[in-house]
Amino acid sequence: MENNKTSVDSKSIKTLETKILHGSKSMDSGISLDVSYKMDYPEMGLCIIINNKNFDKNTGMACRSGTDVDAANLRETFTNLKYEVRNKNDLTREEILELMHSVSKEDHSKRSSFICVLLSHGEEGKIFGTNGPVDLKKLTSFFRGDCCRTLTGKPKLFIIQACRGTELDCGIETDSGTEDDMACQKIPVEADFLYAYSTAPGYYSWRNSKDGSWFIQSLCAALKQYVHKLELMHILTRVNRKVAVEFESFSTDSTFHAKKQIPCIVSMLTKELYFYH
């Protein structure tokens, strides 16, 4: 157990008829042959790391000590996975939105996927620039299928290390497809996104001033260990387990002492994702 110092469906819509569209590639068993994302494009893709450590005084938000450790660890991890990593530090909310808009307008046609890591203060549905909050929905909307066509049908991963509220978890003891196919398919604009949150809705997310955040430490370790063996959702389940079991806060303030954390994965992926091919 880690003991280092830690910081802290719609009732108004009438029933509509639906139709089932059967895929063109299938087996007699009904299982689709095209179950995993194509990851053998010429490039793996971009990995944008936004690392906000220092904040304007008038925001009242503290310096995020230990976040540089996370940023360095993430850069090494995704560079080893052949991503083009771009680190950005201490961005305002306007700069974050400008960056995301700019990246979404790039040509991703030769890229397999897209990753964005957000390291900052936060609250439910928001991430903080150095001068104030940004709605996550607005930030990620630039990459929807109808906005960023060269990433349509490709996995878009958002990794978010930030608080989602002020609740504290005290814990409890326990016993124990082809390109031709894609051209004729219509998919939801919100498809193929995955959000990996460091903590559950409403809760604090813990960070160690020396070793970095519990979530990013665990994520990087799991990727290094399992990336050539397991599918992404299986890897993230290992991350959940590691954070839940191996970490606990240590503080001289009893309010914040012996607290736990569980990451939260929200997936709209439509296929399995293997980083190897």
UniProtKB/Swiss-Prot annotation:
One of its GO terms (biological process) is execution phase of apoptosis. GO terms for molecular function: cysteine-type endopeptidase activity; endopeptidase activity; enzyme activator activity. GO terms for cellular component: cytoplasm; death-inducing signaling complex; nucleus. It is found in: Cytoplasm. It is an enzyme of class 3 (hydrolase). The modification N6-acetyllysine is found at K11. Involved in the activation cascade of caspases responsible for apoptosis execution. At the onset of apoptosis, it proteolytically cleaves poly(ADP-ribose) polymerase PARP1 at a '216-Asp-|-Gly-217' bond. Cleaves and activates sterol regulatory element binding proteins (SREBPs) between the basic helix-loop-helix leucine zipper domain and the membrane attachment domain. Cleaves and activates caspase-6, -7 and -9 (CASP6, CASP7 and CASP9, respectively). Cleaves and inactivates interleukin-18 (IL18). Triggers cell adhesion in sympathetic neurons through RET cleavage. Heterotetramer that consists of two anti-parallel arranged heterodimers, each one formed by a 17 kDa (p17) and a 12 kDa (p12) subunit. Interacts with BIRC6/bruce. This is Caspase-3.
